[in-house]
From Swiss-Prot:
Coiled coil: none
Domain of life of the organism encoding this protein: Eukaryota
Signal peptide limits: none
Biased composition regions of type Basic and acidic residues, renumbered to the chain: 8-20, 339-351, 364-385
Protein name: Protein kup-1
Region (Disordered), start-end ranges: 1-20, 326-385
UniProt organism field: Caenorhabditis elegans
Amino acid sequence: MDDELDYGSDHSIHGDVREDLSDSELQLPKDRLDAIIDRKEKIATEKAFGINDSSDKHLNVSIAETAALRKEIGASDQNSHLDSIYAHGVEAMDEFEIQKMFANFRPEKVWKKDNVAMVQFQYRRDVAAMMLNMSKMMRRVRGRKKADEEGEVLSDDDDVEEGQIMQEKDDDVELIEDLKPNEKGIVASEKNNEFITVDINAREVPNGKWRVLTKHVPANMFVIIRYATTDEYQTMVTSDRSQVKKTGVKRGNDSFWTHESSNRGGLNVFDKEGKELEWDYEHDTRFYNEDKNEEKVEKVKLPQGIKIKGRGAVKCGFLFGEGSSSLASDDTTPVKKRRTDEKDYEKDDIVSRQGSSAHAIRPGRVERPIRERIQFPGREDPDEY
């Protein structure tokens, strides 16, 4: 038959995929070209079957967001390993707990030494997405006592006015009077929730610009992260195994139909011991009503039908309601819908905070979707930037 499928071809179902490739993509090596074709065929198949990839929405970040994030932290290709983070304050956690903390963003490897750890992710965009969804920029402040009855202020910062910004430990420090930090050194602020304000007199913080983890972290822990520098990455990778614990994390087999990985994150809810709870996915019975305010409509009772007798009446009687000729399915209550396993994150609006200077876009330029990003030299994946 002329319309019979060619099962000997790898691309028989979507024969037009190769025609959609650009000239630059056609010049790529065969293995990378095959990867692009496979990905586009997968997208086309999902679209044909109406499969929506909603589980990875938290991984989507734009070029502008990534550029603004790196600018705020001071990271670049020249000084940082952009697929890895450096975490400080994880002395009470083992490698598995650290991996589980970032599980929704596809961590690959974990190295831990004393109270610091380095986590390498699958792609650079995963690191950016994790930072924007799981952390907030740290703002350093220093408290100063209020003046006493005689008007004297007992402080080493007598020459510095309140609110003045100073440079200490490669970061900005603001002087504020009468600070009241909590046990972790964090100062609560109702006016500004874009930053985590930390009193450096109450908590010692390493040099540089850091972001404070706000998701999947026990209440009694203070964990800060940033991009790992090139020197830190080389030191951690080449260290003796007796000093540095290394954990290789399996990626898990992504299901074509469910897009779920075998590495699952927790609920961001912790017990008294500080352990994060997780759902029992095998016996999960969470259900919900889609509309609680749904009006109750009284059913009009139909007159009782004539009882049917004859061949098949007994065998098929379960189809009808008791003493009625109407189908039993018409009288049953609908089954409640099950909650979907969506990742609930609130992304840091870093582009708005930094303004238009964070990422200059030429007039007329249109940012393409994440799957159609341009190929940068030296990247292993077209989506990596």
